[in-house]
């Protein structure tokens, strides 16, 4: 791994941790990197009171982080040392730091788990759905930033390219506004009869999607993207059909096609999969 890649990725991770702490008010944010032997190591942190967790190495399957890597899903516990969904080899380190509630989310780039994003508090309070959603949104944004770093390197973009990347990671609310705007633009393009204007609107939509999309082999049609954009807004099949001016059965057909292409089992898995490959923001 070259020095420039390490610096670029560390900057993106640091920005994510800072942004997450600001957005949630949670005192502790951490990132654990997946090592070559599938162990985790906490390599960056904000707000730790002691060195107990700093640079801590976590064996596969151990604790919250190990479970996240094993399941590839978010994990949250409100009382770490008593939680029955995780193993407890690292309880002493957690107790030394004084953490109680922890939420951890995987960071996945090109289907490979690159690390785990954590938040934690030093008191016995439950971290609610709003916090979990914010951590998840930040993880998704970090995934895209890491993917952009990788894409820029593959394309030989020279050093000193900071102007091409955001100086900070958007928080969940800001990112959701981008997604909502993208979906509404796609719906507007769908209703426009002027072909030139429609193409202009579709180009605007494309500009809101990360460069990862260019490298993907999975090809989604414009109509399939329209359906996904509706689903991303929370529309039912009937509402999507009304928005697009087509039948509900046609919407279902598009969704089945999308789910098959993306290997998704539900409509919301399809939306998340599309975001991972850069087909949706």
UniProtKB/Swiss-Prot annotation:
InterPro entries: GAF, GAF-like_dom_sf, HTH-type_RamA-like, Sig_transdc_resp-reg_C-effctor, Tscrpt_reg_LuxR_C, WH-like_DNA-bd_sf. Induction: RamA represses its own expression. SMART domains: GAF, HTH_LUXR. Keywords: Activator, DNA-binding, Transcription, Transcription regulation. The keyword Ribonucleoprotein does not apply. SUPFAM superfamilies: C-terminal effector domain of the bipartite response regulators (SSF46894), GAF domain-like (SSF55781). Pfam families: GAF (PF01590), GerE (PF00196). It comes from the Bacteria. Residues 213-278 form the HTH luxR-type domain. Transmembrane segments: none annotated. One of its GO terms (biological process) is acetate metabolic process. CDD domains: LuxR_C_like. RamA is a master regulator of acetate metabolism. It positively controls the expression of acnA, aceA, aceB, ack, pta and ramB genes in the presence of acetate. RamA is also a positive regulator of rpf2 gene expression during growth on glucose as the sole carbon source. NCBIfam families: transregRamA. This is HTH-type transcriptional activator RamA. It comes from Corynebacterium glutamicum (strain ATCC 13032 / DSM 20300 / JCM 1318 / BCRC 11384 / CCUG 27702 / LMG 3730 / NBRC 12168 / NCIMB 10025 / NRRL B-2784 / 534). The gene is ramA.
């Amino acid at each position: 791994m070259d020095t420039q890649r390490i610096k670029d990725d560390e900057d993106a991770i640091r920005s994510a941790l800072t942004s997450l702490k600001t957005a949630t008010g949670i005192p502790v944010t951490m990132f654990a990197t997946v090592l070559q032997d599938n162990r985790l190591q906490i390599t960056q942190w904000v707000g730790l009171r002691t060195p107990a967790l700093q640079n801590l190495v976590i064996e596969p399957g151990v604790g919250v982080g190990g479970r996240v890597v094993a399941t590839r899903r978010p994990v949250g516990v409100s009382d770490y040392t008593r939680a029955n969904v995780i193993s407890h080899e690292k309880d002493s380190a957690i107790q030394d730091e004084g953490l109680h509630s922890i939420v951890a989310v995987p960071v996945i780039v090109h289907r490979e788990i690159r690390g785990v994003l954590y938040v934690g508090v030093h008191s016995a309070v439950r971290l609610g759905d709003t916090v979990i959603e914010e951590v998840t949104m930040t993880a998704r944004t970090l995934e895209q930033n890491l993917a952009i770093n990788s894409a820029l390197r593959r394309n030989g973009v020279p050093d000193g390219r900071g102007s091409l990347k955001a100086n900070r990671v958007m928080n969940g609310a800001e990112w959701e506004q981008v997604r909502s705007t993208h979906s509404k633009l796609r719906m507007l393009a769908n209703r426009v009869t002027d072909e030139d204007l429609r193409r202009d609107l579709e180009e605007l939509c494309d500009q809101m999607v990360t460069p990862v999309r260019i490298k993907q082999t999975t090809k989604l049609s414009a109509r399939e993207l329209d359906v996904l954009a509706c689903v991303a807004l929370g529309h039912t099949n009937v509402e999507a059909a009304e928005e697009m001016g087509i039948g509900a059965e046609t919407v279902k057909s598009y969704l089945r096609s999308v789910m098959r292409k993306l290997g998704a089992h539900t409509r919301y898995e399809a939306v998340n999969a599309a975001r991972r490959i850069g087909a949706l923001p």
